């Protein structure tokens, strides 16, 4: 198992817990809730995320699980994909039981805790796209209609259900980017990339002009003209300076910065830890992404490689959109920062996907060890043979 990836995950989870300990009570009191609401909730989310990561890490570990998966993989993935699509459609209808709507958007289910099915759709899209690429590569139909039709149908469903019905542009972009990067790495031609890019642009404009698009247009307008949210995010970075104001001294968390514990946690880290703290965090993400892509390069099986690349794209998209939105480089999308932000659904699902990468790194490192051992054996045998010839 890649120890560096494990250490980075532990560090990020610990930093997120520390930040929640520092600002959670202030945010809770500002909202009229008990001061330990968010800290206790985040501890519970981390516990569930660790379990999810362990499940992902041992998913294919046992021989019986591997054989069952190989035999029924296609049926399981298709059922999971279409079942998750149906669940997200259900979530989009406000009149149905358990559906939870906030600020005019129906994205959550109230099942004793708030759960966001679009996060589960990321896992479904990850497995579905990896299977589609691997299956079509094996059959020699990759890049043909047998590949493009189901892929574009899947992408269209994501745009309509998550982007239009649930009004969640952030998760829509993450899923489409993930599916696109997996297809690109698998061997898309430049012509196919151009066509796919054109379709994405057309779809984005259509999404902005479909139905109740006011809040999406406002996000784009605020990007060029400034906004309360964006301005206060920059103020948070300025307040932190080079070394930060320290734990417990955040001003932005007292109500000046919206969604301080989730969608705006990077400016809070910049305020508490300063420029150096924020840069250390970004360096940590760069190392994590590098180790993930290094794992993907060692995978011989196309489907396994696509799974790892998909997780790479998932984390990369979240980091770019969260950080880029907070520093004013791109429009805000309301996305979390992986392993740090408050949010049980997001944390659990990305932890499960990360666990899959850890599991795949076990096999690649085991293969590397076997290769090194056999190589040393061959070299030792050569030296011994030479010595015997000389004697």
Tell where the protein language model's regions lie, with residue ranges.
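Hydrophobic, glycine- and aromatic-enriched re-entrant/interface helices and adjoining loop segments
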Residues: 102-108, 194-281, 299-307
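Hydrophobic alpha-helical segments of polytopic membrane proteins
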Residues: 76, 81-82, 148-209
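Hydrophobic alpha-helical transmembrane segments
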Residues: 44-48, 122, 272-289
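Alpha-helical transmembrane segments of multi-pass membrane proteins, especially transporters
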Residues: 37, 146, 150, 175, ...
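Alpha-helical transmembrane segments of multi-pass membrane proteins
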Residues: 12, 84-91, 130-131, 158, ...
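Loop-to-helix entry and N-terminal half of a specific, functionally important transmembrane alpha helix
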Residues: 297-334, 340
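Interfacial segments of multi-pass membrane proteins
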Residues: 173-192, 253-277, 334-351
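Membrane-helix boundary/helix-loop-helix interface segments in multi-pass membrane proteins
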Residues: 1-7, 18-21, 26-166, 323-338, ...
């Amino acid at each position: 198992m890649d120890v560096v990836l494990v250490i980075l995950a532990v560090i990020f989870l610990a930093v997120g817990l520390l930040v929640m300990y520092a600002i959670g009570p202030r945010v809770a009191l500002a909202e009229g809730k008990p001061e330990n609401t968010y800290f206790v909730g985040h501890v519970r989310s981390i516990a569930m995320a660790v379990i999810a990561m362990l499940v992902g890490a041992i998913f294919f570990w046992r021989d019986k699980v591997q054989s069952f998966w190989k035999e029924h993989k296609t049926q399981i993935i298709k059922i999971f994909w279409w079942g998750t699509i149906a669940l997200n459609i259900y979530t989009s209808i406000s009149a149905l039981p358990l559906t939870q709507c906030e600020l005019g958007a129906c994205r959550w289910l109230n099942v004793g805790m708030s759960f966001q099915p679009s996060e589960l759709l990321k896992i479904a899209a990850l497995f579905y796209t990896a299977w589609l690429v691997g299956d079509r590569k094996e059959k020699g139909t990759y890049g043909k209609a047998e590949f493009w039709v189901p892929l574009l149908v899947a992408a269209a469903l994501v745009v309509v259900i998550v982007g239009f019905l649930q009004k969640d542009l952030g998760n829509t972009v993450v899923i489409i980017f993930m599916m696109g990067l997996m297809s690109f790495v698998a061997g898309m031609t430049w012509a196919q990339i151009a066509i796919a890019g054109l379709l994405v642009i057309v779809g984005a404009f259509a999404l902005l002009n479909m139905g109740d698009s006011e809040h999406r247009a406002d996000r784009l307008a605020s990007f060029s003209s400034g906004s309360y949210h964006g301005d206060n995010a920059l103020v948070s970075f300025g307040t932190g300076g080079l070394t930060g104001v320290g734990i417990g001294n955040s001003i932005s968390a007292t109500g000046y910065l919206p969604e301080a514990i989730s969608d705006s946690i990077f400016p809070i880290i910049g305020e508490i830890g300063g420029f150096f703290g924020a840069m250390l965090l970004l360096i940590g993400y760069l190392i994590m992404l590098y180790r993930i892509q290094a794992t993907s390069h060692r995978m011989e099986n196309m489907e396994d490689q696509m799974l790892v690349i998909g997780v790479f794209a998932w984390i990369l998209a979240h980091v770019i959109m969260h950080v880029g939105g907070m520093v004013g480089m791109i429009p805000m999308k309301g996305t979390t920062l992986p392993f740090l932000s408050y949010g049980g659904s997001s944390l659990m699902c990305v932890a499960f996907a990360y666990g899959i990468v850890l599991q795949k790194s076990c096999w690649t490192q085991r293969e590397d060890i076997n290769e090194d051992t056999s190589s040393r054996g061959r070299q030792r045998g050569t030296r011994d043979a030479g010595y015997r010839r000389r004697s």
